[in-house]
Amino acid sequence: MNPNTIDSIIKQLIASHTTISTMESCTSGLIASLITDTEGASAIFPGGYVTYLNETKVFVGVDPSVIEIHGVYSPECAEAMARTVQENLHTAIAIGITGTTGNLDPNNADSVQGVVYFCILYKAQAHTFTFQTNVSGMTRHEIKQLYAEQVFAELELSLIHI
């Protein structure tokens, strides 16, 4: 992951006064951490959530029926996560991400190894993405970095239209 690219994205958000928030599951707060690596990020990043458990997602406001109907590992859940954090923190952009970082999740039957779902929400417009890769031989940290790279790559493309 190129830190200069992320820095450039965050500086663009700062310059345009465009706020951003995150709700992360499989990346465990890495996206938020990378956002705040840029000096001045507090001007556009009020915070985010790390919601590793389904119960935590529901606690912060994700509708439990989304998880029950579509599963926690789904584009619908990623979008619900983004909408929830956007509503709670009143940001222009919100990111929701859910998926697995290794073995299948015994607590969620819908888990597929190496598949991540994320949503970039700008105002009310949702863009959902599914990314699948072979994660065998990768550490959990490497997988999280790969997923974060995908999010920032799509965010960079989205900013062209903002």
What are these language model-derived features?
Residues M1-I160:
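Short alpha-helical segments enriched in small residues
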